[in-house]
Regions:
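Conserved "landmark" site that anchors the functional core of diverse proteins
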Residues: 1-326
Length: 326
């Protein structure tokens, strides 16, 4: 893709936002190394869909994309460019004509790009060749609205804003576009298995409470967002109501006083004082982020070595997946 773009092709034009949708955010891979400043990671809720959106456009893995939650985003292209949309199945049209997700294609200046609403799942990712050109804040373009950091103004994308991007060169028109085979595309469902590594604070939960936690299903409550998912189901009790505030990892499963688990995600606070029964592995956190109220999860306890094996298995599958030239 680097042969398609030139430095001269970078300009303040890109996509004009005519409808911002339910929640659309500028995101790159995330903001790291700023916990000491009280700044969390941000980044894509579904890291796998984010990865493929950038890969289909030939981008670096940290290139800036747009994360669309639930749908409704509408844009007018101001330049010729190559885009791809991945993630939850949202109807995608260009000038009213249906387009396919999980593949890259050319969009010309003046084209209208519209996303409908997801029938299942929550989030999708719109990438453009070369990435959106957004100024980094604290080393990242990732938007965290709670912290007013990242993106264009530290907030969600708004109507009449322009999302700058690169212009495709004349040679780009002749470039073969890419598609991820359907067999390699994620399946979005209404229930997810969450592999969980027990934490050292498991000592505050009796053997019976832990067995009940892993034996029962939980439903996503009405309180779910990029910060975390509050679940509802069989309450789990710890022998303490709180701990001294400490750092919180991605995927941490907090058990507050009411016993209803909270799985913390990208926009979580950097410290917290609830006991944690364990942590969900990152690949399953991405799956969790595609659930909505009423959907179901089941926790399964695994060891650190099993978590490491799953990481390498998922990495191997990612490397084996081959994009198809169209």
């Amino acid at each position: 893709m680097s042969k398609v773009l030139t430095k001269a092709a970078i300009n303040p034009l890109g996509f004009l936002v005519t409808n911002a949708g339910v929640l659309s955010l500028v995101q790159d891979a995330g903001r790291f190394g700023a916990f000491n400043l009280g700044l969390t990671n941000g980044g894509p809720a579904d890291s796998l869909a984010f990865y493929w959106a950038n890969s289909l456009c030939g981008n670096a893995l940290n290139a800036t994309v747009i994360e669309i939650s639930l749908g409704g985003l509408q844009l007018i292209a101001q330049v010729d460019c190559i885009i791809a949309v991945t993630g939850a199945p949202m109807p995608l049209t260009v000038n009213g004509r249906a387009k396919t997700l999980w593949q890259s294609f050319l969009v010309k200046a003046g084209d209208s790009v519209c996303l409908g609403f997801a029938s299942v799942g929550v989030r999708c990712y719109l990438a453009v060749a070369g990435g959106f050109v957004i100024k980094a804040s604290f080393g990242s373009t990732a938007t965290v609205c709670r912290e007013s950091v990242g993106g264009l103004k530290g907030a969600k994308i708004a109507v009449n804003e322009v999302l700058p991007c690169h212009v495709v060169s004349r040679g780009g028109y002749l470039r073969k576009h890419l598609m991820l085979p359907e067999s390699r595309q994620p399946h979005y469902a209404n229930e997810v298995l969450l592999h969980t590594v027990l934490s050292y604070q498991q000592q505050h939960f009796s053997a019976i409470e832990k067995r009940l936690f892993f034996a029962n299903d939980y439903q996503v409550s009405k309180h779910w967002d990029r910060m975390g998912y509050r679940l509802q189901g069989r309450a789990i009790k710890a022998d303490i109501n709180g701990i001294l505030s400490e750092g919180i990892c991605y995927g941490a499963v907090q058990i507050p006083a009411d016993g209803q688990p909270i799985v913390l995600l990208n926009d979580r606070q950097t410290i917290g004082g609830y006991p944690k029964i364990g942590a969900v592995i990152s690949s399953d956190c991405a799956k969790l982020s595609q659930l909505r109220q009423g959907d179901s999860v089941h926790f399964e306890a695994i060891s650190m070595s099993q978590a490491d094996n799953l990481f390498h298995l998922n990495l191997s599958r990612l490397k084996q997946a081959q994009l198809i030239h169209l």
